[in-house]
């Protein structure tokens, strides 16, 4: 008897589904791309339970006949290609004929569809890949597909899913990218009957960009349009002031397909050069058009990764065009990018509302009085702040805090820094200090960063906040808004007072007292990027440490700021009291020591 057997259709279907359908966002991608290929001008997506309970996609495309509907759920059945030669010039988003049967293999599906010239439509039901019912139905032209109980017959895969809110955020993020790729199509996303995303389908990319990222970001984008050597480029580059800590806001579209292409993303970053600080990434939406023969999309069932056959040439050409575009435009941020006044309120506003989840309720802060205590200023008063015995004594208390479960530890104690005396400032970056055992060179920014970081951690998770005289409006994309709603308590514990303003808009009313003016929006966006990089592995303690490091970096005295001798000595004294004085929170060295013995050897004594 042969050991090798041909698998039954059900088992083969589940294996194929494992490649194509990784999670709800995979289903959304395949269904929406089918709607796009069908010529839809409007696509509506409804989600329940993050897509695990139900995903509905409604479009006004060409629809299917009864015969095509049945064939569409057969493996390797497609209307997109006819022969192998067509694989060399694919112009549609789908072509493999695997998506619908793979989705049907791990879910329960209901489909209603009608072509424009038909008097009636067709309704069909599938479960576990099997057709269980079919008949006529009255419905508008187009197709409506509802996928229920995703992974109901693969419990191991279902258990591996994230929380519904996280899965829903992934779905919303993908639809946002598709809206950028196809600005001529109107996209809508609804959750429990409430519309959470809408793009107008005007055909203008800037309108879709405003729908995804908000009008504030759209207003700071630089238009790029060029044609060179068979490459057509159309899109927008964000000014350096919009930079992020991850590539989450780089959207690459090739031949109308949203893709991940590291070479193109690197070319976009390379075009900015020194316009961006180290570790920062631009905001960019670029649509490239190349000959279909130069684009291989048949390298993965999900069709998200592609291969450009002249990748190096295309990336080099693109980088040059983008450099020219950035050089031609003013990239200095306008005054409108920064919050006007940027003043803190010492009196606590009664009844400030902090949104803490979708329908989960509103947390109201208790009323508070006013205080006449001094609040330290921003960078211009940095020398005064450095000499204060305890900066916490001069800041109004938080109006509302949660009890800290524990105080985050920031590492085992190491050898203490000896007593140092400041000798000179050279250049206004490093402090030259003398100790009993040699000469010390101290990075003033890294040292102050370490001090602030440990002060934040030592206070636990109940951070004091300062209210802003003028709240900062945050226009987020759907993914960011979902993260903020889900993790709002974490932000509150870190010292941020945030109010949901409706849709994907929030008001930042208060910030940790250490944060200098003008950094409010950027720190929130960086903290949201943290969750994208960590995913489900983000714990509250790790988030608090990361937030403390980010706040400390933005609050510390900068390289190039001149300090008086008393201020330098105060900084050194505070540094010696830290648990880890030799590195900053990001791991960079704070102190370099030249012992007397090393100096004697250098001078050959």
From Swiss-Prot:
At the top level of its lineage, which domain of life is listed?
Bacteria
**Care to name a GO molecular-function term for this sequence?**
mismatched DNA binding
Q: Which InterPro entries match?
A: DNA_mismatch_repair_CS, DNA_mismatch_repair_MutL, DNA_mismatch_S5_2-like, HATPase_C_sf, MutL/Mlh/PMS, MutL/Mlh/Pms-like, MutL_C, MutL_C_dimsub
- Name one process (GO BP) from the record: mismatch repair
Q: Please provide the record's keywords in A-Z order.
A: DNA damage, DNA repair
A single GO cellular-component term on record? mismatch repair complex
The yes or no answer to whether the keyword Heme is present is no
UniProt keyword Manganese, yes or no:
no
Q: Which PANTHER family match?
A: DNA MISMATCH REPAIR PROTEIN MLH, PMS, MUTL, DNA MISMATCH REPAIR PROTEIN MLH1
Under HAMAP family, the record lists: DNA_mis_repair
> Which family does the UniProt entry place this protein in?
Belongs to the DNA mismatch repair MutL/HexB family.
Job of this protein: This protein is involved in the repair of mismatches in DNA. It is required for dam-dependent methyl-directed DNA mismatch repair. May act as a 'molecular matchmaker', a protein that promotes the formation of a stable complex between two or more DNA-binding proteins in an ATP-dependent manner without itself being part of a final effector complex.
Q: Which NCBIfam families match?
A: mutl
Q: What is this protein called?
A: DNA mismatch repair protein MutL
Q: What organism is this sequence from?
A: Pelotomaculum thermopropionicum (strain DSM 13744 / JCM 10971 / SI)
